[in-house]
UniProtKB/Swiss-Prot annotation:
Residues 1-24 form the signal peptide. Transmembrane segments: none annotated. Residues 28-60 are annotated as: Disordered. Keywords: Glycoprotein, Hydrolase, Lipid degradation, Lipid metabolism, Secreted, Signal. The active site is at 197 (charge relay system), 393 (charge relay system). It comes from Drosophila melanogaster (Fruit fly). Its EC number is 3.1.1.-. One of its GO terms (biological process) is digestion. It is an enzyme of class 3 (hydrolase). Residues 29-51 have a biased composition (Acidic residues). Could be a digestive enzyme. This is Lipase 1. Belongs to the AB hydrolase superfamily. Lipase family.
Length: 439
């Protein structure tokens, strides 16, 4: 059964790669030519490697296999592993970069990702290390179903019932359990929160459905929030995946991307490149900010596994234009929601001060959708459109210059660093915050 599911998902990935190649040909070959030149330069320079280059290659190989807690410890940070049980029995793993007595900061990953997303690019790039360097007690969550949270008090991951959840349940049960655990361990009454993509989706579900948790969060930093998705309907990959789920083969899938992507991409150098193209086809192309050398590390941790129902739920909100709980048959909806359609989430109930970061080349979170979401949220204190036009959905984590283009702005919002110039550094906090709100 497991082998059959793997073959089905490999076929889906092959279709995605095929679509990506067509997209690349339509866009043009400039990026391909540039990348080929870079590859030739790399091949020519292998013999001339410096000791630093050899060390980098060794680190890349090692970092692709280490677990998140060991990865954190490797780079000299105090690392801890915590386990949290949700109200409905899922056992979640949390990773911590400990700073005793410092304000707690919870980071929550996106779809098919894990806590690794916030550390995978290393101390000079990744957000978790940056926050730890600026005196935060950093906690990294793992949603049910990914490689670190595949346990339950009564259910087995090999049973289909284990996978009967979406990001609705992550918001209803996972995030509250993790927040309560962090506050209990640290003794703080509130924490800061940052989510990427689905990490925002589930957060807004939590705050709208369990509004008491608004009072447990100091601020929400929303990176590429996947909430409204009306403008994503024509995305070719969404169409392909939707057709797949409607097929006889795809309708039986319960879990996805638990090693299949990694298996395909590591077959040859060409399949690795095709996989990069497939990712770009989904999230947006940006070769200039993509560190090709780090892709083996990314592949070691991403994708980390996901329930098919999570993906189906996203497709539902894309097609319907409604940010709402999972929609079943009309009869089951009547039983669950007392209506033929599930009710929309009430975003006005999200009262946490929320700062939104988005980009123009994000194929999964269109700027128009993000701005519509901001209009409906209860307390948007600022929004920031990343200036680089090519910045894509995964650049929020993987971009070479993400610290300069994005994280520095976040630290300014959090009050950790002043604005860029000496003159700006002398401005009052109110002026700095006001500038951010108007941007």
């Amino acid at each position: 059964m497991r082998c059959s599911l793997r073959m089905q998902l490999l076929l889906l990935l092959g279709l995605c790669v095929f679509i990506s190649r067509i997209q690349g040909q339509l866009i043009g070959g400039e990026e391909d030519e540039e990348d080929e030149e870079e590859e030739e330069e790399e091949e020519e320079s292998v013999e001339d490697e410096t000791p630093e280059d050899r060390l980098q290659r060794k680190n890349i190989k090692q970092d692709s296999t280490l677990s998140v807690d060991k990865l954190i410890a490797k780079y000299g940070y105090e690392s801890e592993v915590h386990h949290v049980t949700t109200e409905d029995g899922y056992i979640l793993t949390m990773h911590r970069i400990r700073k005793q007595g410092a304000p707690p900061f919870l980071l929550q990953h996106g779809l098919v990702d894990s806590s690794a997303g916030f550390v995978v690019m290393g101390p000079n790039v990744s957000l978790a290390y940056l926050l730890a360097d600026h005196n935060y007690d950093v906690w990294l969550g793992n949603a049910r179903g990914n490689r670190y949270s595949r346990n339950h008090t009564t259910l087995d991951p090999d049973e289909s019932k284990f996978w009967d959840f979406s990001w609705h349940e992550i918001g209803m049960y996972d995030l509250p359990a993790m927040i309560d655990h962090v506050l209990k361990v640290t003794g703080f009454p509130k924490l800061h929160y940052a989510g990427h993509s689905q990490g925002c989706t589930s957060f807004f579900v939590m705050c709208s459905m369990r509004p008491a948790y608004n009072d447990k969060v100091v601020s929400m930093q929303a990176l590429a929030p996947a909430v409204y998705a009306k403008e994503t309907e024509d995305h070719p990959y969404i169409r392909a995946i939707s057709l797949y789920f409607n097929s006889l083969v795809g309708s039986s899938i319960r879990e996805m991307f638990n090693g299949e992507f990694r298996f395909l991409c590591r077959m040859t150098e060409e399949t690795e490149r095709l996989c990069i193209e497939a990712v770009f086809g989904i999230v947006g192309r940006n070769w200039n900010e993509f560190n090709r050398k780090m892709f083996p590390v990314i592949l070691g941790h991403y994708p980390a596994g996901v329930a098919a129902k999570q993906v189906k739920h996203f497709i539902q909100i894309i097609k319907s234009g409604r940010f709402a709980p999972y929609s079943y048959s009309s009869n089951k909806n009547m039983q669950l929601y007392r209506d033929h359609l599930p009710p929309r989430y009430n975003l006005s109930l999200v009262t946490v001060p929320t700062f939104v970061y988005y980009s123009t080349n994000d194929l999964l979170c269109h700027p128009k959708d993000v701005e519509s979401m901001c209009d409906d949220l209860g307390n948007v204190t600022g929004k920031y459109l990343v200036p680089q036009k090519e910045f894509n959905h995964m650049d929020f984590l993987w971009a070479i210059d993400v610290r300069k283009m994005l994280y520095r702005r976040m630290l300014q919002v959090l009050g950790k660093v002043p604005e860029g110039s000496p003159e700006e550094a002398n401005r009052s906090r109110r002026e700095i915050r006001g500038k951010f709100i108007r941007s």
